[in-house]
From Swiss-Prot:
The lineage of its organism: Eukaryota, Viridiplantae, Streptophyta, Embryophyta, Tracheophyta. The chain crosses the membrane at residues 83-103, 130-150, 217-237, 254-274, 282-302, 336-356, 364-384, 403-423, 455-475, 481-501, 502-522, 537-557. One of its GO terms (biological process) is cotyledon development. Belongs to the HAK/KUP transporter (TC 2.A.72.3) family. Residues 104-129, 238-253, 303-335, 385-402, 476-480, 523-536 are extracellular. The gene is POT12. GO terms for molecular function: potassium ion transmembrane transporter activity. This is Putative potassium transporter 12. The keyword Nucleotide-binding does not apply. The keyword Transmembrane applies. It is a multi-pass membrane protein. Keywords: Cell membrane, Ion transport, Membrane, Potassium, Potassium transport, Transmembrane, Transmembrane helix, Transport. It comes from Arabidopsis thaliana (Mouse-ear cress). It holds the Pfam family K_trans_C.
Length: 827
């Protein structure tokens, strides 16, 4: 890597001045036809020597097959709405292995935890606890998620960040001010805006956009939900594996607590150690194993109902809940913390929506998961009416003796699959947070060439493993882990309730009565459960709160520092007046080649460009300001990836390229492919720009009423991204042919010397090579900042920047073609 490490002072930055955002681009400066090409300049007596070798790197030609390989099938969105019934059934079967593993393993420990707090003294205790479990599953997973929350998806994507991005599209609540009107041209972005007739929706939108504290509260809410999901990634493996292994305590002599802890740790280490290989090779086994597990639960439940006490179906009467609380009072309130464990993993129904479809998840839950879980809990309750002393290990005691070992093996596999699903969900959640600028940059490894969603984040993986081992080693009991588990689960559910309510009011424009019923009903139930689990803070409930606080702090500091850094870059932009004073030579020598200057600005010229002009003795003939931008949509179609604009007059040969990605997009294209696509799209932009100029000159001879229609058509076309442009509709083409004779436009295009000059200059610069110009920046708080801001920026944010992935590695650019300049941002 070749670097120019120059410590940039504020003075050197100010020398290039600041400019008004109203003059971002200057168009209309005609190219002087007498100006020679760079090849002609090269023949003169200029000796560039080592300088040219440093600034120019010859790129390898990209194979066209590589370009076609980037067109990933299905990356344009979810085409799962009109699937046949048979296909939907197949997808529903697959959801069993990914979505419902966590909820499916809950019968291992729910009643054990409930009756550790409420001793069984009579039949009312068993029926009351069973009734609580039944209606908890019916209200939260069935009524809330299946019938309401799943519909609040973002183009088929679910989860906390999907809801946040959906809200960001309807109201400008993103704290990073890099939104552009052109983003709304993305096919997956375009949605129906709140209608003017509904003043309520517009009022909420205006309040969210104008009041900074509401933006901050919304961001904190989303980050809290994300932190709780990461906490689930720690607690789910520990809880599931320990619960499955606890079956050996009563079956194998000498298998005590120490053996349980050690065996659980061994399985956890093995589970996290194989993450780097991905789940593609064994993923096909997940659904069959979980299907076998669910049908085993249902079969064992039916067996126990028929053998012990079929009358426990009386628990379908909710009056037994009232009797349960009247009889046990405070102990019953404490038992709610164990009851909530029956819906662990309910959030996965929404978070994993992107891999399946709404209909398939609904079908799997209503037809398989829900009835099998009810039968399992009813069967355990029937067994407890005859054997109340077996509450400590009710699941394995209720299994027929002859089936113990087969069920134990299936339970262990189901626990590992449930843990795997939560670990994968944590990886995906962290990746989405990184894409939206809320998490430090980390190395992401894609473990599958066929499925773009399978990723592996080494730092997060080993962190989760260490935390799981600590949780198992410290608590040594599923009862104490359950106290922590409940807080994390309820916290995530309450966040989704608030966000879905906001979606109802802002986007769906639901009737105000129905919209308020949602938080009143489900929010009240979740609040009751939250108050119940919070009473267990001293008994293990503090663990998820510590994890959530830690990750919330990290994510908010990173977002806060990133926003301040972006605002500093906006303030220090180079003015257009200064660029005009420099002239087309930019006050230095322009040599053949293309300089790709990476920056975060979507408007204006970044101050780091002035630093390169001061530092380098020459600059490339073509400069492209490249901005990698994540927009609040799941995926951006490949043909809509690049957006080009011209910067400065034409003879400057400077452009802005915004490469747009969704928060679910995978940036793993080869640098050569990226370069080829970028150059191709730039050529198309130049041709479209010349076409627009030709149209403007031709339209002057036509009727204004007819011209305005055609002008709008072409203007919309030019505003769209320029790779593999979709063909316009036939009516539009017919209209254009009526208004504008194709012969006149075509002849003017062919005879345009300015276009031929620019294309020749671009091809010559491409042949000379591409160089990546990067900023190696440091962020510091201003001297007059308050103490807290200095502490956060100069120490915490600086620590995160030093230890996160470097910009060059994160941008996936070739290291041999890099020039870096140092710079300090004062915020």
């Amino acid at each position: 890597m070749e670097e120019i490490e120059e410590g940039s002072s504020n003075n050197s930055i100010r020398r290039v001045g600041t400019g008004s955002s109203d003059r971002r681009w200057v168009d209309g400066s005609e190219v002087d036809s007498e100006t020679p090409l760079f090849s002609e300049i090269r023949d003169r007596d200029y000796s560039f020597g080592n300088l040219r070798r440093r600034l120019m790197k010859k790129p390898k030609r990209a194979d066209s097959l590589d370009v076609e390989a980037m067109e990933i099938a299905g990356s344009h969105g979810h085409n799962l709405k009109d699937l046949s019934l048979l296909t939907t059934l197949g997808i529903a079967f697959q959801t069993l292995g990914v979505v419902y593993g966590d909820m499916g393993t809950s019968p291992l420990y729910v009643f054990s935890d409930v009756f550790s707090k409420v001793p069984i003294r009579s039949e009312v205790d068993v029926l009351g606890a069973l009734s609580l479990v039944i209606y908890t599953i019916a209200v939260i997973p069935l009524a809330k998620y299946v019938f309401v929350v799943l519909k609040a998806n973002d183009n088929g994507e679910g989860g906390t960040f999907a809801l946040y991005s959906l809200i960001c599209r309807y109201a400008k609540v993103n704290k990073l001010p890099n939104q552009q009107p052109a983003d709304e041209q993305i096919s997956s972005f375009r949605l129906k805006l709140p209608t003017p007739e509904l003043e309520r929706a517009l009022g909420i939108k205006e309040a969210l956009e104008t009041k900074g504290y509401l933006k901050t509260l919304l961001l904190l809410l989303v980050l809290m939900g994300t932190s709780m999901i990461i906490g689930d990634g720690i607690l789910t493996p520990a809880m599931s594996v320990m619960s499955a292994m606890s079956g050996l305590q009563g079956e194998v002599k000498g298998f005590g607590t120490n053996a349980l802890v050690m065996s659980s740790i061994v399985i956890l280490v093995a589970l996290f150690s194989i993450q780097r290989f991905g789940t593609g090779k064994v993923g096909f086994l997940f659904a069959p194993v979980l299907a076998l597990w669910f049908f085993s639960l249902g079969a064992i439940g039916i067996y126990n109902l028929l053998k012990y006490d079929f009358t426990v179906i009386r628990a379908l009467n909710p009056f037994y809940i009232v009797l349960f609380f009247n009889k046990n009072s405070k102990q019953a309130w404490s038992a709610l913390g164990g009851c909530v464990l029956c819906i662990t993993g309910a959030e996965a129904m929404f978070a994993d929506l992107g891999h399946f479809s709404v209909r398939s998840i609904q079908m799997a839950f209503t037809c398989v998961v829900f009835p099998c879980l009810l039968l399992a809990y009813m069967g355990q309750a029937a067994y407890l009416t005859k054997h109340p002393e077996a509450s400590a290990r009710i699941f394995y005691d209720s299994v027929p003796k002859s089936l113990f070992w087969p069920v134990f093996v299936i339970a262990t596999l189901a626990a590992m699959i449930a843990s795997q699903a939560m670990i994968s969900a944590t990886f995906s959640c962290v990746k989405q947070a990184m894409a939206l600028g809320c998490f430090p940059r980390l190395k992401i490894i894609h473990t599958s060439k066929k499925r773009i969603g399978q990723i592996y984040i080494p730092v997060i993986n080993w962190f989760l493993m260490i935390m799981c081992i600590l949780v198992v080693s410290i608590f040594r009991s599923t009862t104490h882990i359950a106290n922590a588990y409940g807080i994390a689960e309820v916290g995530v559910m309450m966040v989704s309730t608030v966000l879905v309510t906001l979606v109802m009011l802002l986007i769906w424009q639901t009737n105000i009565f129905l919209a308020l019923c949602f938080p009143l009903i489900f929010g009240s139930v979740e609040t009751i459960y939250l108050l119940a689990v919070l009473t267990k803070i001293l008994e293990g409930g503090w663990v998820p709160l510590v994890f959530a606080t830690f990750f919330l702090t990290v994510m908010y500091i990173w977002n806060y520092g990133s926003v301040l850094k972006y605002q500093s870059e906006v303030r220090e932009r180079i003015s257009m007046d200064f660029m005009r004073e420099l002239g087309s030579t930019l006050g230095t020598i322009r040599i053949p080649g293309i300089g790709l200057l990476y920056n975060e600005l979507v408007q204006g010229i970044p101050s780091i460009f002035g630093q390169f002009l001061l530092t380098l003795p020459a600059i490339h003939s073509t400069i492209i300001f490249v901005c990698i931008k994540y927009v609040p949509v799941p995926v951006v179609p490949q043909e809509e990836r690049f957006l080009f604009r011209r910067v400065c007059p034409k003879d400057y040969h400077m452009f802005r390229c915004i490469a747009r990605y969704g928060y679910k997009d995978v940036r793993k294209e080869d640098s050569r492919v990226f370069e080829q696509l970028l150059i191709e799209s730039l050529e198309k932009f130049l041709r479209c720009e010349a076409l627009e100029d030709a149209l403007e000159s031709t339209l002057n001879d036509f009727d204004p009423d007819r011209v305005s229609v055609a002008s709008d058509t072409y203007t919309d076309d030019l505003m769209a991204p320029l790779i593999h442009r979709a063909k316009r509709s036939e009516p539009e083409q017919e209209l254009d042919s009526e208004v504008l004779p194709s012969s006149s436009v075509g002849s003017s295009m062919e005879e345009d010397p300015a276009l031929e000059y620019e294309l020749a200059a671009l091809r010559e610069a491409t042949d000379s090579g591409l160089t990546y110009l990067l900023a190696h920046g440091d962020v510091r708080a201003k001297k007059n900042s308050i103490f807290v801001k200095k502490l956060v920026i100069n120490y915490f944010y600086a620590f995160l920047r030093r230890n996160c992935r470097a910009g060059a590695a994160n941008l996936t650019v070739p290291h041999m073609n890099i020039l870096q300049a140092g710079m300090t941002y004062m915020v």
